Design a protein with these regions (language model features):
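Short catalytic-loop micro-motif centered on adjacent basic/acidic residues
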Residues: 149-153, 246-248
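PAPS-dependent sulfation machinery
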Residues: 68-151
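Conserved phosphate-donor/acceptor-positioning beta-strand/loop module used by diverse small-molecule
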Residues: 153-155, 164-189
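A conserved segment at the C-terminal end of the G1
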Residues: 50-63
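The Walker A (P-loop) glycine that initiates the GxxxxGKT/S ATP-binding motif of P-loop NTPases
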Residues: 42-43, 153
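PAPS-dependent sulfotransferases, especially Golgi type II membrane carbohydrate sulfotransferases
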Residues: 1-32, 188-312
Length: 312
């Protein structure tokens, strides 16, 4: 009940605040997108994208959208200016999260409602009303405030790559990869935890199998994962390998500092110079792998993966 009231109040306040964005909108600011092109973290849900996002926001000098600003999807530039001006929140970014949501108002956000202003639920960009130009102006306004490249993490962007690259011509994509069976188990556990229903869709819809009630949950989950990475592969073939940086979740956990430095080096090769902050990078993180579901579910998911690999 309290959450619904909060949402209703924020929705009303966003409508009121939206006209203020025009005060800061300047087409000349689009030049900042060439100076500081955005970087997008993509991959399957439950692949480790959130912890990579937190690590990069904490240890490299990226700009990012925090949880406070995320509450203002229709007035993000105004909200960022207010936050920069008045916030005394100095909570450090921690590496805790719950299904993509980080802690504190200062924590990195997926910024989901903002992106749905510009994209359909089918992942198609809303091309009407000169939206490409409007979105570029809005993101460039945020970039101007931060004076550094913005990094965004939202797994739905895995299905929007070509549109994002068309809008942000110099943008780059960091792809998280993890063992498929580990991802599948984590998605299944998320379905059970959030909905108490193994068949309830979770996170990005990348395949119609996810929405077909006649299809088994193990097939729907594996189809979801496969469709996401197939779309990333297609985008890589279309745009070129140099637009993508691939990161192994296992390597990230077992050699955290080394992988962050590798990412920094790869960005530098692509003309993105992102210095490290002075805080200490952890040597490694807990690597979660192995069986996390019942024997029956584990067998079903494993067999479904093998079935796909045989077809492939």
């Amino acid at each position: 009940m309290i959450k619904k009231i909060k949402t209703s109040i924020l929705t009303l306040l966003n409508v009121i605040a939206h006209p203020l964005e025009k005060l800061w909108s300047d087409e000349k600011d689009i030049k900042y997108l060439d100076i500081f092109p955005p970087v997008f973290i993509i991959g399957s849900p439950r692949s480790g994208t959130t912890v990579l996002y937190q690590l990069l926001c904490k240890h490299l000098q990226f700009g990012y959208i925090n949880n406070f600003v995320s509450n203002w999807p229709k007035a993000p530039v105004t909200a960022t200016k207010l936050y920069e001006r008045f916030s005394k929140n100095s909570n450090p970014i921690d590496l805790k999260s719950e299904f993509g949501n980080s802690s504190y108002m200062s924590g990195p956000s997926e910024f989901g409602e903002f992106w749905y202003r510009w994209f359909e639920r089918s992942h198609r960009f809303k091309f009407d009303n000169n939206n490409i130009k409007k979105l570029r102006i809005e993101i460039s306004g945020l970039t101007k405030i931060h004076q550094r490249p913005l990094i965004f993490k939202n797994v739905v962007h895995s299905m929007r790559i070509l549109s994002l690259r068309k809008i942000f011509r110099e943008s780059l994509f960091i792809v998280l990869e993890r063992k498929k069976l580990d991802i599948a188990q984590s998605i299944l556990n998320a379905r059970i935890y959030l909905y108490n229903d193994k068949n309830h869709p979770f996170s990005v819809v990348s395949s119609q199998d996810q929405l077909d009630p006649k299809i088994s949950y193990e097939r729907a989950i594996i189809s979801q994962i496969n469709s996401i990475y197939s779309n990333i592969d297609l985008a890589e073939d279309t745009l070129g390998k140099d637009k993508f940086i691939f990161v192994s979740y296992k390597d990230l956990c077992e050699n955290t500092e080394k992988i962050l430095k590798n990412i920094q080096n790869e960005l530098e090769k692509r003309n993105q110079n992102i210095p490290f902050n002075k805080n200490k990078v952890p040597d490694k993180l807990k690597y979660s792998t192995g069986q996390k579901v019942s024997d029956e579910d584990y067998k079903l998911l494993k067999n479904e993966i093998k079935k796909y690999d045989r077809i492939k």
